[in-house]
Swiss-Prot record:
Keyword DNA damage: no
Gene designation: mntP
Protein name: Putative manganese efflux pump MntP
InterPro entries in alphabetical order: Mntp/YtaF (IPR003810), Put_MntP (IPR022929)
Transmembrane regions listed in the UniProt entry: 3-23, 42-62, 63-83, 101-121, 124-144, 160-180
Function: Probably functions as a manganese efflux pump.
Record key words, sorted: Cell inner membrane, Cell membrane, Ion transport, Manganese, Membrane, Transmembrane, Transmembrane helix, Transport
Subcellular compartments: Cell inner membrane
């Protein structure tokens, strides 16, 4: 049960981006939602595995910079979304480019990398943990994308601004949490 709650917590940043993407592109197709959610799920699943195998060797270095990298990427994506709010269209080609999605997936999965490092100190089946984390993230992102699409229809261009603000706030939360700890 603890793994499920951990998986939900790790997925929240990806869920926020999925909801924002659904809101900013009201004609997002089921296949796009699947691809985006799958990519977020894959990153959330593999980052703990990478962290697990990095273990103690690089713990000081990784824990020192991961927050700054995540903040910078989320700030960039958030500002970009806010700028794009002036150009919103119902027939959105949506910068759901692989590059942009991978940046978002990477930034939101850095905390999963850190969790993977902590897994290396515990007796845990990393394969099962990674599968559960990835699956939970995937399912929640699919749901959030559809919810975002409904919100996008109601809010129109304001949804893109809201999505950008959410990304910036997530980045700020990451950096503040790092500075407090």
């Amino acid at each position: 049960m603890e793994l499920i709650f951990l998986s939900i917590a790790l997925a929240m940043d990806s869920v926020a981006i999925s909801m924002a993407n659904g809101a900013r592109c009201m004609n997002i197709k089921a296949l796009q939602i699947f691809k985006m959610s799958f990519l977020f799920g894959i990153f959330q699943a593999f980052m703990p595995v990478i962290g697990y195998f990095l273990g103690l060797a690089f713990v000081g270095f990784i824990s020192y910079i991961d927050h700054y990298v995540a903040f910078a990427i989320l700030l960039f994506l958030g500002i970009k979304m806010i700028k794009e709010s002036r150009q919103i269209s119902v027939h959105c080609s949506l910068n759901l480019s692989l590059r942009m999605l991978m940046l978002g997936a990477f930034a939101t999965s850095l905390d999963a990398l850190a969790v993977g490092i902590t897994f290396s100190f515990e007796e845990i089946n990393i394969a099962i943990a990674a599968f559960v984390i990835g699956l939970v993230c995937f399912v929640l992102c699919v749901i959030a994308s559809y919810m975002g699409r409904v919100l996008g229809e109601m809010l129109e261009s304001k949804a893109l601004v809201l999505g950008g603000v959410i990304l910036i706030l997530i980045g700020c939360k990451i950096i503040i949490t790092h500075l407090i700890n």
